[in-house]
């Protein structure tokens, strides 16, 4: 018996296996299938599975096997045939299920049959794809469809889901083959919640699908939604409350969640309320509803300009903040009666730039033909400048800078207010009231004269040192200066530099003794071209740093630039340059001075007749009396018709308004022109020094040599030297600022005539000696004595240098003209 059963067992085992893809002679082991079509020989099974996709072949323990199990559950749901697999059916529904399942099996269920097409079937066509099938090919036949209908193995799929019919089980309905699931749905609706066939009389239909009445509820809170509002999420219904709490999107603009009742705009995973306020440009807030927009970095913009962060209504310049601040202060200064300073700033910027290149940023030109290089070559040895003129103008700068007791309150900068209000160690004191100053001008008190012993070791003023101008420039660039960008009109930066000079004891008693000689007007023609106006250039740099002159009054100031080519340079759009390289916010004020000054030079006027000064002792004016020059240099002074000095006359349109000073009315209005010149005197000086050299050497006075000077110093009294040193420390730091004005103001001669002698006192030689004024007192105080310098000329009494006052140079305009005609001072010795 076992021997008879052995062939049958081997045949059964062979039916459960398939041959390998290789030849049987290769010796490879046969692979098992999880399922094989019934009634086929091994070679026929191999041909059938060869027609299927590899991933769908049901090898044992293969993805194809898992796919087969999944398709069995999906295509043939057990709850469609068996009551035990249903969750909640009434007794009536259970009966209906049984009837329904039996009817389907009876009327539609079938299994496909695998056959090889015979050679006689020459015109067989696949029912699914419509392509012709040849004899000898494997084909699937469905008995319910008819004997002549066949399909390719890969085309035997459900008509609804287009999936291969698992295990060749099909349901035939209306000429189409279906899987068990979709065939049942053709007859009865299926609940989307429980996946069961709905046998009840009522159901809920939504979104093209059906639910049991009790199954159509919120997935979160299980609230029945029949007849209510709901929201579908991934095929599941939610009530509005649960959906907002779980899945509501938040607006990118306002941050609030977008409710179910609100329309929303969505782009690239971002959401906005569909309102003009929320769905708008991130930069200009323009509504983008119905408009194209530009997304960038999570934001939406209306244009490329807005996406770059630019304001189309504002300036795109990087210095617009500085420019707007300067414009505001310029407008405020005009309302307050203060000058906009645009013309001075343009000229000073031109001085610091090459003559033909306005964009050069340096303080001195690198080319030999630049204007700053030429100015540097004027006086290289004039590092410490004319003491007499400097002390006169600088004392007036300090006086006028602190004139208004409440001027500090007009400035917005806190540091400027402190400097204006308190000064540095009471150096700048509040001046007396306007009434007192009209009555009399006080002499400088002794306590204002600070004699610092360390001043003897300083041979230059602080601002005159080579590195100082660069240091203060960098300081202002860093925002450390009081008026670094010209944001407010005020003298704080200039005054602070003067205070620093005093603190460092600049230009002490032992100053370079050649400066007196080199700074005097008579010696200007001896200056070598290699020399530079160091202090004038420093003052220009400092003026550019602060962006505001010390005076800042709205009265037009004279423009005393006498270089031949400078006015041509000045005419070329000087408003394009400002202190810091930005557009000058005060461009409208550029023509007030340049046009008037040129006008005054084109139209020469009558020369003011000279007046001989009153015979009074030579006295040095104190800080309170020495305000900056208040005189407009009109054409009667600048005109050189009678002096043979080549000074170009400006056109009529650029002439400054001439101001005539009536010194006999000084008692009634002594302070109407107080804030006229301050730092401008420093910058103007650099230009006029060039024309001063045209005086020949024969017009100079006899001067002391260094050896004679040492002997002269030893002969001076100790008390006189002490008084001199005090004044030298106070006024010595102001260097080289006013030597150019001496030639051009005979009106100032009248102004200072009360304090000087006639021409003899200004131009007296050192051959005679007198002790009458060696120790003079005035108003109970010793007369301040200027510092002695080498190569310095003195008056007959040897009490003080004649150039200690600017007055001699104001009078030398007339004396030099006399000398040209053969008239000399009675005590003058021409060297």
From Swiss-Prot:
A lipid is attached at residue 828 (S-farnesyl cysteine). PANTHER family: LIM DOMAIN-CONTAINING PROTEIN, PRICKLE-LIKE PROTEIN 1. The modification Cysteine methyl ester is found at residue 828. Interacts with REST. PROSITE patterns: LIM_DOMAIN_1, LIM_DOMAIN_2, PET. Signal peptide: none annotated. Belongs to the prickle / espinas / testin family. Residues 797-812 have a biased composition (Polar residues). It is found in: Nucleus membrane; Cytoplasm, Cytosol. The modification Phosphoserine is found at residues 315, 591, 594, 683. Keywords: Cytoplasm, LIM domain, Lipoprotein, Membrane, Metal-binding, Methylation, Nucleus, Phosphoprotein, Prenylation, Repeat, Zinc. Involved in the planar cell polarity pathway that controls convergent extension during gastrulation and neural tube closure. Convergent extension is a complex morphogenetic process during which cells elongate, move mediolaterally, and intercalate between neighboring cells, leading to convergence toward the mediolateral axis and extension along the anteroposterior axis. Necessary for nuclear localization of REST. May serve as nuclear receptor. GO terms for molecular function: protein-containing complex binding; zinc ion binding. CDD domains: LIM1_Prickle_1, LIM2_Prickle, LIM3_Prickle, PET_Prickle. It holds the Pfam family PET. The gene is Prickle1. One of its GO terms (biological process) is post-anal tail morphogenesis. This is Prickle-like protein 1. Residues 829-831 form a propeptide.
């Amino acid at each position: 018996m076992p021997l008879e059963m052995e062939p049958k067992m081997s045949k059964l085992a062979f039916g459960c296996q398939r041959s390998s893809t290789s030849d049987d002679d290769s010796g490879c082991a046969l692979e098992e299938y999880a399922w094989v079509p019934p009634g086929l020989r091994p070679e026929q099974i191999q041909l059938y599975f060869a027609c299927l996709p590899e991933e769908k072949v049901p090898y044992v323990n293969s993805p194809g096997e898992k796919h087969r199990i999944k398709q069995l559950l999906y295509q043939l749901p057990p709850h469609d045939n068996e009551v035990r697999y249903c969750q909640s059916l009434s007794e009536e529904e259970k009966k209906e299920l049984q009837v329904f399942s039996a009817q389907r099996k009876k009327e539609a269920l079938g299994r496909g049959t695998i056959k090889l097409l015979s050679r006689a079937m020459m015109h067989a066509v696949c029912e699914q794809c419509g392509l012709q099938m040849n004899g000898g090919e494997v084909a699937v036949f469905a008995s319910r469809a008819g004997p002549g209908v066949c399909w390719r193995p890969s085309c035997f799929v459900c008509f609804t889901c287009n999936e291969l019919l698992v295990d060749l089980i099909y349901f035939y309905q209306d000429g189409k083959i279906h899987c068990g699931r979709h065939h049942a749905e053709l007859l009865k609706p299926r609940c989307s919640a429980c996946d069961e066939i709905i046998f009840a009389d009522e159901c809920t239909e939504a979104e093209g699908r059906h639910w049991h009445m009790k199954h159509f509820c919120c997935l979160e809170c299980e609230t029945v939604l029949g007849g209510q509002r709901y929201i579908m999420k991934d095929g599941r219904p939610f009530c509005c409350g649960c959906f907002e709490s779980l899945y509501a999107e938040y607006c990118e603009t306002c941050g609030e969640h977008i409710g179910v009742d609100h329309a929303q705009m969505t782009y690239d995973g971002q959401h906005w309320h569909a309102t003009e306020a929320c769905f708008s440009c991130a930069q200009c807030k323009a509504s983008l509803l119905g408009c194209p927009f530009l997304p960038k970095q999570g934001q939406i913009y209306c244009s490329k300009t807005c996406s770059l962060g630019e304001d189309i209504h504002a300036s795109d310049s990087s210095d617009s903040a500085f420019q707007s601040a300067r414009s505001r202060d310029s407008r405020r200064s005009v309302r307050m009666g203060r000058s906009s300073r645009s013309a001075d700033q343009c000229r000073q910027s031109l001085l610091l730039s090459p003559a033909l290149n306005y964009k050069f940023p340096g303080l001195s030109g690198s080319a030999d033909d630049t204007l700053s290089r030429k100015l540097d070559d004027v006086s290289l040895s004039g590092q410490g400048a004319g003491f007499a003129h400097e002390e006169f103008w600088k004392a007036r700068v300090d006086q006028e800078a602190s004139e208004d007791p409440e001027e500090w309150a007009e400035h917005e900068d806190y540091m400027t207010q402190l400097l204006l209000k308190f000064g540095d160690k009471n150096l700048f004191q509040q001046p007396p009231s306007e009434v007192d100053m009209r009555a009399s001008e006080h002499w400088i008190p002794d306590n204002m004269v600070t004699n610092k012993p360390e001043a003897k070791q300083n041979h230059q003023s602080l601002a005159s040192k080579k590195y100082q101008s660069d240091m203060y420039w960098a300081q202002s660039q860093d925002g450390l200066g009081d008026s670094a960008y010209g944001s407010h009109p005020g003298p704080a930066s200039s005054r602070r530099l003067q205070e620093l000079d005093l603190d460092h004891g600049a230009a002490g008693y032992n100053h370079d003794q050649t400066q007196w000689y080199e700074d005097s007007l008579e010696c200007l023609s001896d200056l070598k071209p290699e020399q530079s106006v160091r202090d004038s250039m420093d003052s220009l740099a400092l003026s550019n740093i602060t962006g505001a002159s010390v005076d800042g009054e709205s009265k037009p100031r004279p423009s005393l630039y006498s270089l031949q080519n400078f006015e041509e340079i000045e005419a070329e759009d000087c408003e394009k340059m400002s202190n810091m390289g930005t557009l000058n916010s005060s461009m409208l004020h550029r023509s007030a001075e340049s046009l008037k000054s040129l006008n005054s030079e084109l139209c020469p006027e009558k020369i003011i007749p000279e007046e001989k000064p009153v015979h009074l002792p030579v006295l040095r004016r104190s800080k309170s009396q020495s305000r900056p020059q208040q005189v407009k240099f009109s054409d009667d002074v600048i005109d050189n018709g009678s002096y043979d000095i080549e000074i170009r006359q400006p056109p009529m349109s650029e002439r400054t308004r001439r101001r005539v000073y009536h010194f006999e009315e000084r008692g009634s209005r002594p302070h109407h022109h107080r804030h006229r010149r301050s730092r401008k005197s420093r910058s103007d000086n650099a230009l006029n020094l060039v024309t001063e050299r045209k005086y020949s050497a024969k017009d100079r006075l006899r001067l002391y040599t260094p050896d004679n000077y040492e002997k002269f110093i030893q002969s001076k009294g100790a008390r006189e030297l002490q008084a001199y040193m005090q004044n030298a420390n106070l006024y010595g730091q102001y260097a080289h600022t006013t030597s150019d004005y001496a030639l051009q103001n005979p009106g100032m001669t009248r102004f200072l005539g009360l304090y000087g002698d006639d021409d003899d006192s200004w131009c007296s030689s050192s051959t005679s000696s007198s002790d009458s004024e060696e120790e003079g007192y005035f108003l109970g105080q010793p007369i301040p004595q200027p510092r002695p310098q080498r190569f310095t000329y003195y008056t007959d009494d040897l009490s003080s240098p004649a150039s200690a006052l600017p007055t001699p140079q104001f009078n030398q305009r007339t004396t030099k003209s006399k000398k040209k005609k053969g008239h000399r001072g009675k005590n003058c010795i021409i060297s």
